Amino acid sequence: MELTIFQVDAFADSPFQGNPAAVCPLDAWLDDERLQAIAEENNLSETAFVVGRDGDYRLRWFTPQVEVDLCGHATLATAWVLIHKLDDASPVLRFATRSGELSVRREGDSLAMDFPAKRPEPCATPDGLLEALGIAEAEVLKTDDYLVVVDDEKTIAALAPDFARLKGLPCRGVAVTARSQRFDFVSRWFGPNVGVNEDPVTGSAHTSLAPYWAQRLGKTRLSAEQGGARKGRLECDVRGERVVISGKAALYMSGTLHL
């Protein structure tokens, strides 16, 4: 069996930026063990598998270790492949996923993804969280991630987490965020529980980050940058119970899987 595969840098306008994702279009689903094996072999933070045509698709995402419920950057990468490599001219691409229906539309030279908003709630700071991050004091909130809000964006740039300690926490991942001089906010995201120590640009985390900062800053349109050494940029628009997350993407390579 031969399958075409693409590697796309999401939330970037050229290669070597943003967050790389593999995209594998399928005529029909392979068994779950084979999908997981492909994702493990790719060894990227996410591999997306997509089935469908003409604007109507089913989409699944796998890290090297597990299938996940939502992945923003791999959704962006998938939409880019469908539009630019598989010639889908539909004005809106719709994806049936484990998180419900998601849609992506073109907005100029960007792609806009419509996701359910997740509003973080204040919570008690779990034992070991701040110590694992090397942070003395922070505001802590929770959705499926812990959101750790610090006062200075320089703190985020200097983070060197203890991933073994983070892995024991009861969450999908940990997003650390702060106000920024160049953007409305910046962040980094760590997910050793799903096999990704640090994800360069995490679209799904912004379904929580954007509502938090929208409320705090009193605005619904927000600019964001995420990442440590490798960074990407996002535009977020909080619309009630939805968040529209926009960004660009760039093809890095394409090839053939021999299974």
Swiss-Prot record:
It comes from Pseudomonas aeruginosa (strain ATCC 15692 / DSM 22644 / CIP 104116 / JCM 14847 / LMG 12228 / 1C / PRS 101 / PAO1). InterPro entries: Phenazine_PhzF-like (IPR003719). Keywords: Isomerase. Belongs to the PhzF family. One of its GO terms (cellular component) is cytoplasm. The keyword Oxidoreductase does not apply. PANTHER family: PHENAZINE BIOSYNTHESIS PROTEIN (PTHR13774), PHENAZINE BIOSYNTHESIS-LIKE DOMAIN-CONTAINING PROTEIN (PTHR13774:SF17). GO terms for molecular function: isomerase activity. Gene3D superfamilies: Diaminopimelate Epimerase, Chain A, domain 1 (3.10.310.10). The active site is at 46. It is an enzyme of class 5 (isomerase). Its EC number is 5.1.-.-. This is Uncharacterized isomerase PA2770. Pfam families: PhzC-PhzF (PF02567). GO terms for biological process: biosynthetic process.
